[in-house]
Amino acid sequence: MWLMLVPLLRGSVACCVRRLPERIAGLHCDSEPSHPVKSSRMSRTLMSLVVLIVAVYLLLCTALFFFQRSLIYFPQPAAVASADSRLKLSMADTEVWVSTRERSGPRALIYFGGNAEDVSRNLPEFAEAFPDYALYLLHYRGFGGSGGSPSEQAIAEDALALFDQVAVSHPQIAVVGRSLGSGVAVRLASQRPVQQLILVTPYNSLEEIAAKQYPWVPVQWLLKDRFESGKYAAHIRVPTLLLAASDDEVIARDSTQRLLENFPKDVAVLKVVPESGHNSISDRPQYWQWMGDVLNR
């Protein structure tokens, strides 16, 4: 049986050997076009990947442009809302509320809070620390029952309206702004005759802060509300106190320093509250002491 298979195997092997060059040649001819095909497929894959990355980037930039104010403003309700502690500003397009502590006399204090602050919570402490002042704490649009939506321009208009209304009965007005509100305060002080200006955890511009947080985004083209405090600081002529937190995790010290340098010479002074953060600065005794040194003279 095995001997009968030998001639058959020999014939098969011989046939295969004779056809091997043809098959090799065939393989060679078939394989030559495969390199351009693979290269073309790779190019298309890379191009698709680049297009996808660009599309995602543009989508993110578009989302940031349209939803940026939801990343800046975080409206809070008012905790202190009794009728005798609130003033209504009737603006052209909405109504804006102000938490107040009325006091007769020439002195008044207007306060602008942070981007997620319920300013009414400051009333008890402000009333105790500054007993001779009538107090006016502005609720930004969308905050504390105020109508409308917040924006830099709208808040600036509300601040001017509040100042003009308060000035009718209080000729000596001090302005205090904290965090985001420091930008509101310095802009107002450049346009109205304030008595003193205090800026708590202030910044040179919101654009600078946003550019550091989103270095991959063309912030200078997308940002709507820039809060360019440094630009307005150059026009301030009244005594100004800047209070920085020693361990501020939101506002970099160099931003506050650049703001200080934009004030005219001998107008502003910077003090650093020790062992304090961006949100805890008002828990330190120096915060109240240094503000009192300015306001309670």
Where are each of the predicted segments found?
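An N-terminal hydrophobic leader/cap segment in hydrolases
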Residues: 49-89
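Membrane-embedded segments
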Residues: 97-165
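Gly/Ala-rich beta-loop-alpha elbow adjacent to hydrolase catalytic centers
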Residues: 177-181, 185
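Active-site nucleophile loop of the alpha/beta-hydrolase fold
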Residues: 199-208
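Short beta-strand/loop motif that positions the catalytic acidic residue
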Residues: 236, 242-244, 248
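Short alpha-helix in the alpha/beta-hydrolase fold that links the catalytic acid
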Residues: 252-261
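Short glycine-rich catalytic loops that host catalytic nucleophiles or stabilize transition states
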Residues: 270-276
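Catalytic histidine-centered segment of alpha/beta-hydrolase-like enzymes
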Residues: 276-285
